[in-house]
């Protein structure tokens, strides 16, 4: 099988002889070729097993180290051009790794999934597993062995998540327990160049400052080469670094431009674009499905980060974040406004409740307060007579309240007497003296009063009567001849005075006694009888069999039982 020729710069190659080959033919000697693809420190030593010497030209590029074991490198000592190295199909790729202060070599073809217990690490002339290597390095307390092992100062997990390194033939052999990144970006899914193409240029990210190592690969035939390409050695897209450095169209190298121009010239651009679109869609669809089935993982974050940086979509992501932030701020402002309005309404409700309670208390106090009826205006009394003394012969009568229907002539009488503890005085007015009953003052009701009349009367007459301050009404009586008034030695039957409510009409019934006993009975009944049928408050008129009846109607008002506008009428048989 024809050999594939790999051309690399001399400064990027380190030749290291293997063990046990010192006395053999140089043509049969195996060597270690170090391709510097990742940033490492100058003068890297690997436990003395490999003699590692980086040329000055390589140290200037700050590139990474990849160990390649080949068969024979012909006549290097004889001055053959070291810029061209022939490698056959038995090439083995190795990575120098570290764990703490310990250093070892990771044999990539033995590094199969899941890798933790696979003997793929060469440490102190022994082939051990990564787990054993971490234990010997004193980092067994770390649960994640991929974080404990570093490749060029970078954690192995980070290298695997970014797609720069993966398990050997991971797409074919996977234990489903690796939990490593299994996505195919353009840089990891690149295939060998099209058959017939002599030279292709690929670029890989090499350092944080954006320096790029170019590997020129020339081959006679892909079918004869049989070389397996790995994502760590070939790439089709220039990836932006983690610092977000963008590659403008002006910064693209001429070789890269020629590469894509060649694809377009052979008519494969449409197919390449379709494949790229399909791969990206499948990649993003897988991320969405994993988000639904399980919590967000680190591998998904690495995929999205690489896609966003590769295609310059970070601005789009920032726009989405800005829109969501604006929506959240608007919602927060609306929430605060609503909360403030609700607090204001609550304060108003509290004030209304307090006002309502105060009004209710005031109304209740008013209802429970005793109602005092205003006193009606006092009416002027009919007359303010003197006390129980004998009035003068000519008392002044300014406002007569009673009208004399039938005047009579009465002989003057000048004597006074009392009966039943009721003071009685004789009123002399010209030739017509009248007996006046003066009752004691006070709010109590006076039940009885007495009048005097002649023993024998032939013609009844009516006289004017002036009631006292405490007597509501005094009725006149039928008198006989004035000559007989001197014989007033007997008292007639008493007069009953009954009170009733203020403002009601009073009826006064005066009845003259028969001529046989010569007595006159005057009854005053101003209050209605409780057992009477008349509901308007009129007094019941008492009927007696008398010769002469007198009917006196008067109107009583107020609690003092005063009577005004009294009409005295004499009725004869």
Curated annotation (Swiss-Prot):
Gene Ontology MF terms: DNA-binding transcription activator activity, RNA polymerase II-specific; DNA-binding transcription factor activity, RNA polymerase II-specific; Hsp27 protein binding; identical protein binding; metal ion binding; RNA polymerase II cis-regulatory region sequence-specific DNA binding; sequence-specific double-stranded DNA binding
Cellular-component GO terms for this entry: chromatin; cytoplasm; nucleoplasm; nucleus
Cross-referenced Gene3D superfamilies: SAND domain-like
Keyword field contains Nucleotide-binding: no
Main subcellular location of this protein, as a coarse class: nucleus
Annotated region described as Disordered, given as residue ranges: 370-398
Sites where the protein binds Zn(2+): 113, 170, 174, 178
Example GO BP: regulation of transcription by RNA polymerase II
Classification via Pfam families: SAND (PF01342)
InterPro entries assigned: SAND-like_dom_sf (IPR010919), SAND_dom (IPR000770)
Signal peptide (residue range): none
Localization in the cell: Nucleus; Cytoplasm
Keyword annotations from UniProtKB, A to Z: Acetylation, Coiled coil, Cytoplasm, DNA-binding, Metal-binding, Nucleus, Transcription, Transcription regulation, Zinc
Disulfide bonds: none
Residues that bear N-acetylalanine: 2
Record domain SAND: where: 82-166
Keyword check for Acetylation: yes
Coiled-coil residue spans: 321-367
Positions that bind DNA: 139, 143, 146, 157
Free-text function comment from the UniProt entry: Trans-acting factor that binds to glucocorticoid modulatory elements (GME) present in the TAT (tyrosine aminotransferase) promoter and increases sensitivity to low concentrations of glucocorticoids. Also binds to the transferrin receptor promoter. Essential auxiliary factor for the replication of parvoviruses.
Subunit structure: Homodimer, and heterodimer of GMEB1 and GMEB2. GMEB1 and GMEB2 form the parvovirus initiator complex (PIF). Interacts with the glucocorticoid receptor (NR3C1) and NCOA2/TIF2. May interact with HSP27 and CREB-binding protein (CBP).
Protein name in the entry: Glucocorticoid modulatory element-binding protein 1
Source organism: Homo sapiens (Human)
